[in-house]
From Swiss-Prot:
Residue stretches spanning the membrane: none
Protein name: Serine--tRNA ligase
Subcellular location as annotated: Cytoplasm
Binding site for L-serine: T235, A236, E237, E289, S389
Protein family according to the UniProt entry: Belongs to the class-II aminoacyl-tRNA synthetase family. Type-1 seryl-tRNA synthetase subfamily.
Binding site for ATP: R266, S267, E268, E353, I354, S355, S356
Domains (record comment): Consists of two distinct domains, a catalytic core and a N-terminal extension that is involved in tRNA binding.
Alphabetized SUPFAM superfamilies for the sequence: Class II aaRS and biotin synthetases, tRNA-binding arm
Coiled-coil ranges (or none): none
Keywords assigned: Aminoacyl-tRNA synthetase, ATP-binding, Cytoplasm, Ligase, Nucleotide-binding, Protein biosynthesis
Keyword Aminoacyl-tRNA synthetase: yes
Native source species: Shewanella baltica (strain OS223)
Length: 428
């Protein structure tokens, strides 16, 4: 959520910056609502003051033995007017809040302005794509040839966009996640967390999945009088970041760096027809997530570090990649600046996204009321939150199968994964 004071005082500037993201802010309507809010706020306060003043006179009139029926009627009339104004004010505030919750984050000034992914800017490349002297197979043919990827039974058990992994391919998939966690916890200083795969609506509102992206979630339990509805997590960013919701942490505790390996669940409502085959776009997939919670002045440096942590995974695995900075029109809803890391997939002869690393600044923190106590003045201030994939496990498996394939359909195991594979150097 954007800063309400900045929004009120810099409405034109806000509208211009949001327009670079393709979000059109109705300035006239918002201005009208703000004027109505001010009038109702003043009217409510005046009615409250009048009722309080007249209410005090009732006791004085009674003490003098006077009839207070007329005064009581006046207090009742003021009370009715006050209740009506409060209802009107609440309706205006609810509409303003709905608009505020629908607004994406303001893009950082360093984010390139552009309409879509074609205007993202490449910042670096690492590694050289391998030249093959035999026909390249894609990960589907390779995985099925190893009896390790079973799409047919996944469809029978559940439906499309799910997978059953077996044998050494399943073991390799597990090894990838374990390697990532060890790298981030041992070398990069993250604390591993085990988190719920089901989260409530307050958590999803806090990190920005609700209300805008409700259709992309798997809802398992509707809201009732007894409690909030529950949904499967689309990313571990949700439970990890919400650990500081409604909290004030000490400045000395910062930065907080957390990582988790979880299953993630997405309906992919807006991606009909895209990547319908294989592991690239699944309803259920594993991901190792990194989250950093930092002081505002540290968040841009933290974004560079977090992106570097994701890149290190690919470097250790020997997988060629490129890093791009997303333009304003391609950034995620809550992000102010995002780097996408794209891994080379030989069968597609292109780079595909394997990690997205974002600085949310105080956008999520304001929604969550996540703050820290500033040592200098002992006052609370909003935190900055960051998140990134470190990495998507399934897509990493795809990249390893395709980049490390051999002419006979076997797969060479990257050296860093061999300790997790019982010393195996290849499968198949």
């Amino acid at each position: 959520m954007l800063d309400p004071k900045f929004l009120r005082n810099e409405l034109e500037v806000t509208a211009e910056r949001l327009a670079t993201r393709g979000f059109i802010l109705d300035i006239a309507h918002l201005t009208q609502l703000e004027e109505k809010r001010k009038l109702l706020q003043v009217a409510t306060e005046e009615l409250q003051a009048s009722r309080n003043a007249i209410s005090k006179s009732i006791g004085q009139a009674k003490a003098r033995g006077e009839d207070v029926e007329a005064i009581m009627a006046q207090v009742g009339d003021l009370g009715s007017q006050l209740d009506a104004r409060k209802i009107e004010l609440a309706a205006v505030l609810e509409e303003v809040n709905a608009i505020a919750m629908s607004m994406p984050n303001l893009p950082d000034e360093s984010a390139p302005i552009g309409a879509d992914e074609t205007e993202n800017v490449e910042v670096r490349r690492w590694g050289t794509p391998r030249t093959f002297n035999f026909p390249i197979k894609d990960h589907i043919d390779l995985g099925e040839g190893l009896n390790g990827l079973d799409f047919k039974n996944a469809v029978k058990i559940t439906g499309s966009r799910f997978i059953v992994m077996k044998g050494q391919v399943a073991r390799l998939n597990r090894a990838i996640g374990q390697f990532m966690l060890d790298l981030h916890t041992i070398e990069h200083g993250y604390t591993e967390a085990y988190v719920p795969l089901l989260v409530n609506e307050a958590s999803l509102l806090g990190t920005g999945q609700l209300p805008k992206f409700g259709e992309d979630l798997f809802h398992t339990k509707p809201a009732t009088e007894e409690g909030q509805g529950l949904s499967l997590i689309p990313t571990a960013e949700v439970p990890l970041t919400n650990l500081v919701r409604d909290s004030i942490v000490d400045e000395d505790e910062l930065p907080i760096k957390l990582t988790a390996h979880t299953a993630c669940f997405r309906s992919e409502a807006g991606s009909y027809g895209k990547d319908t085959r294989g592991l690239i776009r699944q309803h259920q997939f594993d991901k190792v997530e990194m989250v950093q919670i930092v002081k505002p002045e540290d968040s841009m440096a933290a974004l560079e570090a977090l992106t570097g942590h994701a890149e290190t995974v690919l470097q250790r695995l020997g997988l060629p990649y490129r890093t791009v900075i997303l333009c304003t029109g391609d950034m995620g809803f809550g992000s102010s600046k995002t780097y996408d890391i794209e891994v080379w997939l030989p069968a597609q002869n292109t780079y595909r996204e394997i990690s997205s690393c974002s600085n949310m600044k105080d956008f999520q923190a304001r929604r969550m009321q996540a703050r820290y106590r500033v040592k200098a003045d002992n006052k609370p201030a909003l935190l900055h939150t960051l998140n990134g994939s470190g990495l998507a496990v399934g897509r990493t498996l795809v990249a390893i199968l395709e980049n490390y394939q051999n002419a006979d359909g076997s797969i060479t195991i990257p050296e860093v994964l061999r300790p997790y594979m019982g010393g195996l150097t290849q499968i198949g």
